[in-house]
């Protein structure tokens, strides 16, 4: 009886903690909204019928049946972006002048303006991006090597901006400096971890980013293969050490903890290894990466969420960095690589958890906020074309339109890309072009439907 009471108490405490970490979702889900709008409930894929085209713009849905965002919602987003950019620029006057990172520093702001240039075509944003990246290139620390938290970010972003401005000499100089870090990355004797924020996967992203943004061959195949090989050998080594070679051939840890999520964990590493630009051979993907993903899949909570680490049994965090919003991306990539429906099905289950528990009290940011959670819906929409996920993304964007009105926690770096306002602006701008949206400093190409 005591054990039963303990379980009940734990259950109720869990529910209370969920409420403490997120706001109850006030929005009706897509089926109810579509039904209220006079459209067929559910997606066309689920019912096998094509939804009728409305003759007038429907005030209840933020997009047309063809997926194009309706003008009044576009206007609301554009107005909010302008407002938030003004607040952000004012706030950045007191930001840490030495933080050059993409995560919380100037490179993240450069990435935001690069994104706004991509969405609008306005050259002013590209030049603003250049202003910010120039600051970072003058202050490289030489201490960290990744895209998000190290020198690889400023150098890769600088190379792309200079390339877009047709300053090829400066662009190549950035690439050369980036590749000078290569020896440190591939050295197995180094203490370098493998995760995205501070490890090899974060450097790999920088190389793949250049080949995606500038063009194939910008970084040679050999350099990429050597980084991939170092990541794989490291994963095999820990797996042997932990005696998990058969169950999880590629095992990773950060600070002696086997994290699951996208930022510090296996989801982020597996996701990078499955990128087509990483050119990992099919045998390695099938024999090493796939069973490792399946091992992590089996750690899923009954709710559909995932633990922050393999040893953690508490269903608490629904963030991109820890939980379903990060794992969903590896499941979607696995579905594309291995063509097995189970991965898509579980990605959809992740989406349901994010819809229920993803409006976070931590704020509106990308790493552990509502914007980062909203990107999971955009990724699922691009792959499936199911309007349900576009609707969910739009509703999370609608929440962000009331930035600051919900009583969320104020982050340590309130104007930054991954913790603060810049991230929300990035997400809102991607809602304007959902077909080409991508999670910054993480997603590379665009998910395509088979």
Swiss-Prot record:
Superkingdom: Eukaryota
Localization per record: Nucleus; Cytoplasm; Cell membrane
GO MF terms held by the record: phosphatidylinositol-3-phosphate binding; phosphatidylinositol-4-phosphate binding; phosphatidylinositol-5-phosphate binding
Positions bearing Phosphotyrosine: 198
Record GO biological process: carbohydrate metabolic process; negative regulation of DNA-templated transcription; peptide modification; positive regulation of abscisic acid-activated signaling pathway
Keywords: Cell membrane, Cytoplasm, Lipoprotein, Membrane, Myristate, Nucleus, Phosphoprotein
Family matches, as Pfam families: LANC_like (PF05147)
Predominant location: nucleus
InterPro entries with a match to the protein in the record: 6hp_glycosidase-like_sf (IPR012341), LANC-like (IPR007822), LanC-like_prot_euk (IPR020464)
Modification after translation: Myristoylated. Essential for membrane association.
GO cellular component, one term: cytosol
Lipid-modified residues, N-myristoyl glycine kind: 2
Region described as Interaction with inositol phospholipids: 2-14
Role: Necessary for abscisic acid (ABA) binding on the cell membrane and activation of the ABA signaling pathway in granulocytes.
Subunit (UniProt): Interacts with an array of inositol phospholipids such as phosphatidylinositol 3-phosphate (PI3P), phosphatidylinositol 4-phosphate (PI4P) and phosphatidylinositol 5-phosphate (PI5P). PIP-binding enhances membrane association.
Family indicated by similarity: Belongs to the LanC-like protein family.
PANTHER family referenced in this protein's UniProt entry, alphabetically: LANC-LIKE PROTEIN, LANC-LIKE PROTEIN 2
Official protein name in the record: LanC-like protein 2
Organism, as annotated: Mus musculus (Mouse)
């Amino acid at each position: 009886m005591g054990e039963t009471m303990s379980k009940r108490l734990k259950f109720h405490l869990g529910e209370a903690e969920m409420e403490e970490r997120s706001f109850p979702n006030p929005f009706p889900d897509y089926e109810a909204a579509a039904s209220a709008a006079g459209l067929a409930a559910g997606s066309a894929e689920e019912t096998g019928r094509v939804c009728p085209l409305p003759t007038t713009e429907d005030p209840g849905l933020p997009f047309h049946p063809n997926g194009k965002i309706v003008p009044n919602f576009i206007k609301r987003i554009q107005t909010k972006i302008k407002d938030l950019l003004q607040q952000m620029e004012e706030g950045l006057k007191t930001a840490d002048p030495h933080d050059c990172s993409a995560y919380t520093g100037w490179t993240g702001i450069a990435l935001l303006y690069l994104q706004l240039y991509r969405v609008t075509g306005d050259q002013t944003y590209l030049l603003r991006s250049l202003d910010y990246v120039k600051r970072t290139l003058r202050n490289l620390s030489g201490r960290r090597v990744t895209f998000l938290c190290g020198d690889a970010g400023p150098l890769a972003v600088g190379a792309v901006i200079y390339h877009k401005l047709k300053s090829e000499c400066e662009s190549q100089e950035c690439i050369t400096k980036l590749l000078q870090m290569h020896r440190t990355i591939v050295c197995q004797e180094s203490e370098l971890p493998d995760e995205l924020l501070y490890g090899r996967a974060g450097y790999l992203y920088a190389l793949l980013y250049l080949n995606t943004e500038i063009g194939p061959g910008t970084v040679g195949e050999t350099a990429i293969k050597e980084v991939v090989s170092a990541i794989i050998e490291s994963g095999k080594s820990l797996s042997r050490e932990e005696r998990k070679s058969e169950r999880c051939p590629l095992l990773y840890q950060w600070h002696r903890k086997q994290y699951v999520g996208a930022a510090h964990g296996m989801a982020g590493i597996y996701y990078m290894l499955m990128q087509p630009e990483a050119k990992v051979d099919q045998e390695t993907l099938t024999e090493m990466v796939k069973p490792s993903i399946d091992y992590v899949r089996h750690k899923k909570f009954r709710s559909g969420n995932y633990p922050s680490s393999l040893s953690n049994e508490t269903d608490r965090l629904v963030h991109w960095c820890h939980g379903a919003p990060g794992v969903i991306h590896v499941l979607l990539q696995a579905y594309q690589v291995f063509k097995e429906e189970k991965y898509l099905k579980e990605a959809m289950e992740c989406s349901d958890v994010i819809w229920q528990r993803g409006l976070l009290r931590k704020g509106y940011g990308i790493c552990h906020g509502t914007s980062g959670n909203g990107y999971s819906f955009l990724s699922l929409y691009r792959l499936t074309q199911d309007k349900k996920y576009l609707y969910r993304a739009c509703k999370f964007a609608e929440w962000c339109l009331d930035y600051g009105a919900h009583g969320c926690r104020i982050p340590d770096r309130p104007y930054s890309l991954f913790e603060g306002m810049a991230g929300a602006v990035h997400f809102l701008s991607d809602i304007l072009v959902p077909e080409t949206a991508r999670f910054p400093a993480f997603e590379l190409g665009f998910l395509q439907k088979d």
